[in-house]
C-alpha cells in the first residue's frame, strides 16, 4: 500500500494574503520563500480527528487547526504578546506529550503551539 510521506503544505484563505504571510513571518518566524516553501525542522507530526461538536479549535466554524512545534512555549507566547498578537491566557500540560498554547492570527484562525515533551 502506498502511504503519504508527510504534510506537503497548509493553505489559508485570506482577504490580504501578503499581510497574513507577513504576520506568520514576523510573529512566528515562519520564513517561507517567494513560492511559500518553508523547510521545517525534523520532529513529530500529529494527525488527529475530533468530534464535530468540539470547541477545541475555538470557533465552531473553524474546521481544522494548524499546530506548530516550538522549542520554548513560554518564550514564543511572550514574543507573540510583545508583537500584539491575540494569545490565549491559558496553556495546557499533557504528561508525556508536552505543553500547548494558542494564538489567533489576524484572519481569526486559532493556531496551536506545541512544545513536545
Question: What are these model-derived regions, one by one?
Answer:
Residues 18-19, 74-75, 98:
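Short alpha-helical
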Residues 27-31, 67-69, 90-93:
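Short linear motifs in intrinsically disordered
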Residues 59-85:
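Mid-chain, well-packed structural core segment of small domains
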